[in-house]
């Protein structure tokens, strides 16, 4: 076990175009093989598409989409005796944000549209309307936690 304690949280650099740390986090999740300019082009293209399709600030739509994706409960495996139980636990706000962004980008990549910009744009639109695979993932996670509520007393 490490003796130095937990690593300090590093501050997220604010995005120069939209002035939002959320956009920076989204760019970092889209990033592959260190190609930041490509990731920025994808995210900024999706944000401009949001502005055109919704007619309002893309940051508001992004926040609404993330609120619809963020889980409040998840399950963690806990071994008791010879059995492993799926114990429901509450998700901390930072982890909820991270999971929401991870699911959003992951399910965007799995979509069928031609470019990643289109995939991200459509997944964001679906999520902001309460639809899409990322929102379904949140519902499945909550359902799993709900069905294992009997093991909540094993929480640590």
Curated annotation (Swiss-Prot):
Alphabetized CDD domains for the sequence = uS7_Bacteria
Which GO biological process entries does UniProt record here? translation
Q: Name one GO molecular function term.
A: rRNA binding
Enumerate the Gene3D superfamilies for this protein: Ribosomal protein S7 domain
Q: Does the keyword Signal apply?
A: no
Listed A to Z, the keywords are: Ribonucleoprotein, Ribosomal protein, RNA-binding, rRNA-binding, tRNA-binding
Which SUPFAM superfamilies did the record assign?
Ribosomal protein S7 (SSF47973)
The UniProt record lists the keyword Glycoprotein: no
Organism domain of life: Bacteria
Q: What's in the GO CC field?
A: small ribosomal subunit
| Pfam families recorded | Ribosomal_S7
Q: Matching InterPro entries, A to Z?
A: Ribosomal_uS7 (IPR000235), Ribosomal_uS7_bac/org-type (IPR005717), Ribosomal_uS7_CS (IPR020606), Ribosomal_uS7_dom (IPR023798), Ribosomal_uS7_dom_sf (IPR036823)
**Family of this protein:** Belongs to the universal ribosomal protein uS7 family.
Q: What does the function comment of this entry state? A: One of the primary rRNA binding proteins, it binds directly to 16S rRNA where it nucleates assembly of the head domain of the 30S subunit. Is located at the subunit interface close to the decoding center, probably blocks exit of the E-site tRNA.
Subunit-level organization: Part of the 30S ribosomal subunit. Contacts proteins S9 and S11.
Name used for this protein in its record: Small ribosomal subunit protein uS7
């Amino acid at each position: 076990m490490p003796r130095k304690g937990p690593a300090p949280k590093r501050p997220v650099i604010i995005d120069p175009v939209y002035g939002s740390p959320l956009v920076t986090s989204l760019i970092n999740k889209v990033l592959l093989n260190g190609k930041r300019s490509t990731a920025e082009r994808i995210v900024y293209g999706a944000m401009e598409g949001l502005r055109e399709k919704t007619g309002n600030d893309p940051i508001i739509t992004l926040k609404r989409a993330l609120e619809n994706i963020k889980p409040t409960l998840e399950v963690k495996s806990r071994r008791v005796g010879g059995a492993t139980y799926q114990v429901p636990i509450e998700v901390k706000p930072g982890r909820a944000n991270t999971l929401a962004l991870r699911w959003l980008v992951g399910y965007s990549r799995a979509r069928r549209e031609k470019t990643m910009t289109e995939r991200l744009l459509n997944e964001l639109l679906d999520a902001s309307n309460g639809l899409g695979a990322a929102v379904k993932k949140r519902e499945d996670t909550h359902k799993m936690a709900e069905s294992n509520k009997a093991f909540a007393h094993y929480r640590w």
